[in-house]
């Protein structure tokens, strides 16, 4: 049946388009204000770390003695490289609303993937049998659920998703005795130190403090610095455990 009110329908569509354009303009102005307020170092730390992580990952995989250790090293290296790269792209670029929203989801979801990616080589190297399978299943299931959580609820409050990151990151406490008996004290110390650095970074991110220089190096840069330090610490730990098998 022909539409009896074509002009009204067209007017409604036109109004909807105008409203959408207005929303996009407002979002653009808000984003520009945020860009102006961001510290100048925002994103540069992870941008500098990404190629170094790639090179370090290639070395780790190349020097891994067997297929199992190469798999663990590759998962660890790729998860770190993706996190640092996406973070740098997200924080340094000026994006349209849709691209910005996508990168934000990707950036936050990558934290879960790095947690699981870090657990992978340590579990393969230091645990055996059922304990290895269970811990990897738990952390990867948690990571996948965490990714879905951040993708479909991008606006979740910081106080909610930050503790979830931390809880998944400390899943190893249930296997501490197995890790103690399965590795050199230096590796265990590096594992724990890296975990503490990530936790400290999570607290800085959650409380947005300390914020030493809002114009140049704010709380987010402190958070990024701690994530880099934690990654380096875990990288050294994985390297020692891997090379001891050569």
What are these regions (language model features)?
Residues 1-246:
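Multi-pass alpha-helical transmembrane bundles in non-GPCR membrane proteins
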């Amino acid at each position: 049946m022909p539409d009896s009110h074509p002009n009204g329908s067209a007017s409604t569509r036109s109004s909807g388009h105008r409203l959408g354009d207005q929303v996009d303009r407002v979002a653009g102005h808000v984003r520009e204000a945020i860009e102006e307020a961001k510290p100048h170092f925002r994103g540069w730390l992870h941008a500098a770390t990404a190629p170094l992580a790639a090179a370090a990952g290639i070395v780790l995989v190349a020097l891994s003695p067997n297929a199992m250790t190469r798999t663990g090293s590759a998962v660890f290296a790729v998860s770190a490289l993706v996190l640092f790269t996406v973070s740098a792209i997200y924080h340094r670029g000026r994006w349209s609303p849709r691209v910005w929203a996508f990168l934000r989801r990707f950036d936050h979801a990558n934290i879960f993937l790095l947690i699981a990616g870090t657990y992978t080589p340590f579990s393969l190297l230091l645990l055996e049998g059922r304990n290895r399978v269970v811990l990897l299943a738990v952390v990867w299931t948690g990571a996948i659920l965490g990714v879905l959580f951040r993708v479909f609820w991008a606006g979740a409050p910081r106080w909610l998703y930050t503790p979830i990151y931390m809880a998944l990151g400390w899943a190893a406490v249930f296997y501490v005795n197995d890790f103690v008996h399965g590795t050199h004290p230096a590796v265990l110390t590096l594992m724990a130190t890296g975990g503490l650095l990530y936790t400290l970074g999570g607290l800085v991110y959650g409380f947005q403090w300390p914020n030493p220089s809002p114009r140049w190096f704010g709380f987010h840069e402190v958070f990024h610095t701690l994530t880099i330090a934690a990654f380096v610490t875990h990288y050294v730990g994985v390297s020692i455990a891997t090379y001891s098998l050569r």
